[in-house]
């Protein structure tokens, strides 16, 4: 009889611990999935027509996005966009925002956009926006570096 009670006691402990473990995991997954989408960091153009010339964006926690033209051949960069960034507040996997141009930074940059605002979209790991230069417009696609 003692063996049966001991076996039932052990079984009850195992079931209790297993149930507790599952609840903690579910709670942890829920917490992780509720964190807002994080777009901070460095993003690099993936659809450039050149392997050595492309755009690179830095999204900072101070609420700014800076985009530079990068030219690896002569190791140079030139400002294209400096503007505002509104961080996502939800965990949705798509996001869009309108950035306001920081004209103090862009007005003296030769290759900078003169637009007052620029629309950005994040979807499936890609940030996209339209860029115009020399009368040609292209949708730029960036992926996290």
Predicted features, each with a name:
Residues 49-53, 72-126, 133, 138:
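Contiguous, well-ordered beta-strand patches that form the walls/edges
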Residues 29-53, 142:
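Tryptophan-anchored aromatic micro-motifs
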Residues 6-13:
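Sec-dependent N-terminal signal peptides
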Residues 42-77:
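Short, structured interface segments that constitute the first stable element of a domain
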Residues 1-4:
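Positively charged n-region of N-terminal signal peptides that target proteins for export
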Residues 15-19:
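C-terminal motif of bacterial Sec signal peptides marking the signal peptidase cleavage site
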Residues 39, 57-65, 90-91, 120-127, ...:
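Short, solvent-exposed coil/turn segments at beta-strand boundaries
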Residues 21-23:
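Bacterial signal peptide processing site
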């Amino acid at each position: 009889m003692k063996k049966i009670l001991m076996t039932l006691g052990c079984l009850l402990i195992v079931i209790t611990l297993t149930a507790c473990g599952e609840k903690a995991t579910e709670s942890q997954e829920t917490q992780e999935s509720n964190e807002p989408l994080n777009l901070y960091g460095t993003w690099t153009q993936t659809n450039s027509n050149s392997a050595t010339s492309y755009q690179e964006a830095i999204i900072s926690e101070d609420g700014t996005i800076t985009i530079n033209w990068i030219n690896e051949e002569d190791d140079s960069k030139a400002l294209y966009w400096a503007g505002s960034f509104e961080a996502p507040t939800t965990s949705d996997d798509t996001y869009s925002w309108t950035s306001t141009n920081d004209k103090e930074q862009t007005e003296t940059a030769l290759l900078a956009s003169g637009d007052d605002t620029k629309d950005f979209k994040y979807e499936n790991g890609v940030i996209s926006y339209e860029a115009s230069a020399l009368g040609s417009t292209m949708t730029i696609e960036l992926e996290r570096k």
